[in-house]
Amino acid sequence: MNVDFSQEILALEVDKIYFENTKKEYSEQAKDNYKVLSIDFTKAPMISPFKNSSLETKKELEKISALQNQWNPSKELLMRCDDDPDGVVFDFYDKVNPPIKSKEINIKDLMSDLNIFIIKMKMHFGRARPFQVSDYHNIEIDYNKKMQKTGTAATPSYPSGHTAAAYFAAEIASHHKPQLEKEFLNLANIVALSRIKEGVHFPSDNEYAIKLVNEVLMPAYLRTLK
């Protein structure tokens, strides 16, 4: 009796796909020293992404496709989310009479430290981007080719740096202006959704980014205030 193992072999091959074309300026960031935050990379929650061939990844691709068909934000909004994810939150924060302005919070160095930490995580997992595995699952998605090849998505997929930046900004803003926490988090969620709309991230990339903000980055920020 002949047994067809072609699908199993194909699954093994697709699971070997990683994102290997990280833009040099981003990979170099992983070697930088933190300026403000004290973060122990070895103590961060290490949760591996779904396998490329998994049913979970297929469901994630279906969610990407569905969002792309259902949500039609302006190009200006998508560009804004890509160019300045934390600014989406802090621009609003600065307009609502906060007790301390964002420029006094040392945002530049905080976001620099976030980028160092996130790129370390990305390089650790090396997760493929959605476009690399969509054909295997026979799910058609659109993706921003310029952003993916030479722009802000020229790194491994997991976790999402833009989502991490936006949610870190939202949590910092909420700490200083807690009565507007819902509004800050809503803005961060728009940034997270924009990365799925652009076809450059899986939903779980966003979920892991938020977990890292809550369990690593925000506690590190609060320690700087003591």
What are these regions (language model features)?
Residues 208:
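Short, active-site-adjacent segments that bind or coordinate small-molecule cofactors and metal centers
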Residues 2-201, 211, 215-224:
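Hydrophobic alpha-helical bundle signature of multipass membrane enzymes
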